[in-house]
């Protein structure tokens, strides 16, 4: 995180009906296929793992003992194409969507926190379904889809940060170091949204120079990072006396991070939380700006002690891709310009993620970024530029205005 951004709260969200196309089906597209979902305490059973393209209604019954949610995810397991939430124990709710052919996943989230359970492949067969091009309806669907994604990532973030903080406070430094980059992934995917909330983001994710430049307490992820990698901190700041925090100081620092992440979760799940279409498009652009900034991931300054920048780099790209995909169909419908832009962005996002995958992955780990030489960083930068340049046109194409 580099600079403060103003609070942006706009437009409306949240419907129970989504489409996989981002558009609303024409009337007369046929009766909806009827599937049932049993969301239990430790299971998520869908009555079928395939359906024909067209309208589908999932009737979700909560047989567990916590309020639950049900999601239909895109093939990347990140983009949310449909979700129904706040299903009380014993209650049922319907999710109706229009399914285009493709591969998807279904998942339940008892307690509405964490990564969810029972993630299962779901295949839609048949021909593409015609959808109308009503701009307002398509925009509402895009905003609702991306808002659901933000909420989902915040829900995954909270237990990840708690696990990381627990290890850190317990003095389990090796485990805390392993968890540090993983605990940041969901945050980095939705960083522009987090930055909307005034002082919350600086408390969570400011680097040491940024906090000091603004006269703010140095807290959050990067303060813990500095304490875990003391040798690197001493090397980076040779004129300062860098000492290990006491157990009590660790506890206070960890508690503050969990409190801040809990506040973020509460804010994005509140009835007052809304996003606009421009929040989505400019957020996608902003995520790539975060990577390329002088104190960002590409130059290796974001995680200056841990050198785990490739985790953040990948998460920023993934978050930008999800934001782009939320508005992709709207952009593609904007004449030849939109069709060409989406074709280019599809190609460049795939190329960027393919290049990043040569350095590792979340499960097996990414290479230490300090071992990535300048030629390799230049290659990453060139591909980032090849993606960033067309992405910078997204707001103009979707809304007919320049990016903020």
Regions found by a protein language model. Name each.
Residues 47-66, 93-107:
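Beta-strand cores of secreted/periplasmic/IMS beta-sandwich domains, seen most often
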Residues 19-22:
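C-terminal motif of bacterial Sec signal peptides marking the signal peptidase cleavage site
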Residues 24-26:
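Bacterial signal peptide processing site
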Residues 1-10:
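Bacterial N-terminal signal peptides that target proteins for export
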């Amino acid at each position: 995180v580099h600079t403060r951004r103003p609070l942006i709260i706009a437009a409306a969200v949240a419907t129970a009906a989504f489409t996989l196309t981002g558009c609303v089906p024409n009337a007369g597209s046929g009766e909806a296929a009827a599937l049932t979902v049993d969301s239990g305490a430790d299971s998520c059973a869908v009555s079928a793992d395939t359906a024909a393209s067209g309208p589908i209604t999932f009737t979700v019954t909560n047989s567990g003992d916590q309020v639950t949610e049900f999601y239909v995810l895109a093939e990347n397991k990140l983009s949310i194409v449909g979700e129904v939430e706040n299903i009380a124990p014993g209650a049922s709710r319907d999710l109706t969507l229009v399914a285009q052919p493709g591969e998807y996943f279904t998942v339940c989230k008892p307690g509405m926190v964490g990564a969810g359970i029972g993630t299962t492949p779901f295949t839609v067969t048949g021909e593409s379904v015609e959808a109308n091009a009503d701009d307002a309806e398509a925009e509402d669907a895009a905003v609702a889809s991306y808002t659901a994604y933000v909420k989902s990532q915040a829900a995954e973030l909270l237990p990840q940060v708690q696990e990381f903080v627990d290890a850190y406070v317990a003095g389990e430094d090796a485990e805390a170091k392993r968890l540090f980059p993983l605990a940041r992934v969901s945050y980095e995917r939705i960083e522009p949204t987090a930055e909307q909330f005034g002082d919350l983001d600086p408390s969570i994710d400011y680097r040491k120079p940024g906090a000091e430049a603004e006269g703010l307490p140095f807290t959050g992820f990067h303060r813990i990072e500095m304490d875990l990698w003391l040798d690197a901190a001493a090397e980076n700041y040779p004129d300062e006396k860098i000492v290990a925090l006491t157990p009590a100081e660790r506890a206070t620092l960890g508690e503050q991070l969990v409190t801040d992440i809990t506040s973020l979760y509460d804010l994005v799940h509140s009835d007052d939380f809304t996003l606009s279409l421009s929040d989505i498009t400019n957020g996608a652009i902003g995520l790539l700006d975060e990577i390329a900034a002088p104190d960002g991931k590409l130059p290796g300054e974001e995680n200056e002690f841990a050198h785990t920048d490739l985790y953040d780099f990948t998460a920023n790209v993934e978050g930008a891709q999800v934001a782009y995909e939320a508005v992709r169909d709207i952009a593609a419908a904007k004449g030849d310009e939109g069709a060409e832009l989406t074709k280019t962005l599809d190609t460049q996002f795939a190329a960027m993620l393919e290049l990043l995958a040569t350095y590792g992955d979340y499960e097996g780990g990414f290479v230490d970024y300090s071992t990535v030489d300048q030629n390799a960083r230049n290659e990453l930068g060139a591909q980032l530029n090849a993606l960033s340049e067309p992405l910078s046109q997204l707001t103009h194409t979707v809304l007919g205005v320049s990016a903020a």
